[in-house]
């Protein structure tokens, strides 16, 4: 029995999503593709992540953010769904912060991974 799920995320920026997926070591394809949902249905996705069992997962744009589309019964990633979403959110937030600090004239000086899994960023801006 299929457990097709469409999970809303807070992800709105495609380029930051691609950076986050790459950082997680996932190989993704960018184009409109269809993934199998259940026995005879398909669902359109904008980013496709292939799985060995051919029950691929993906991300689809819906109004103002991306949704994760997957059959949870056929989930074949190195992390549980919850851990995957946590890691993806952290990577996405990291790249969002880096991009915003660059826009404001800051430069990343140091990055420290904390014991609790969080990341401490030290940025600097020179005033001229």
UniProtKB/Swiss-Prot annotation:
InterPro entries: Uncharacterised_Ycf35 (IPR009666). It is found in: Plastid, Chloroplast. This is Uncharacterized protein ycf35. It comes from Pyropia yezoensis (Susabi-nori). Keywords: Chloroplast, Plastid. GO terms for cellular component: chloroplast. The keyword Plastid applies. Coiled coil: none annotated. Signal peptide: none annotated.
């Amino acid at each position: 029995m299929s457990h097709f799920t469409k999970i809303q995320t807070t992800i709105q920026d495609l380029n930051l999503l691609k950076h986050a997926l790459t950082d997680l070591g996932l190989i993704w394809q960018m184009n409109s593709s269809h993934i199998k949902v259940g026995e005879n249905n398909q669902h359109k996705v904008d980013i496709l992540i292939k799985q060995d069992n051919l029950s691929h997962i993906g991300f689809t744009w819906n109004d103002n953010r991306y949704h994760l589309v997957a059959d949870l019964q056929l989930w074949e990633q190195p992390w549980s769904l919850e851990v995957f979403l946590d890691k993806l959110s952290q990577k996405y937030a990291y790249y969002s912060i880096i991009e915003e600090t660059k826009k404001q004239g800051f430069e990343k000086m140091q990055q420290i991974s904390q014991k609790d899994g969080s990341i401490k960023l030290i940025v600097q801006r020179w005033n001229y």
